Amino acid sequence: MPTYVVLAKWTDQGIRAVKESPRRLDATRKSIEAAGGKLLGFYLTMGRYDEVLIVEGPSDEVTATLALSAGSEGNVRTETLRAFPEAEYRNIIAKIP
């Protein structure tokens, strides 16, 4: 399954309800699993983003749907990056003429 790095930043609404964040994380994990994916890692971060999630998703389309769904709740804004593990990276580089 493809791997994704999801960078999340709380909105004003999300930070006002920050104590609900663990419950929202649990709901996010359930949504990812229900869509056939897996939450591989979660980190609270300092700096530009408040949270980083490492997710395996069945496809770009499914992962985009999950990110849009999370954003539509109004607590976070997300930026999703497709991540290529080392083996895929090496394969991609090997194909360069």
Language model regions located:
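Short S/T/G/P-rich N-terminal loop/turn motif that feeds into the first structured element of a domain
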Residues: 1-33, 38-40, 49, 86-97
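Short, well-ordered beta-strand segments in beta-rich or mixed alpha/beta enzyme
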Residues: 5-9, 43-66
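A short linear hydrophobic-aromatic micro-motif
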Residues: 36-43, 78-80
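An amphipathic, aromatic/His-enriched active-site/gating alpha helix that lines ligand/cofactor pockets
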Residues: 57-84
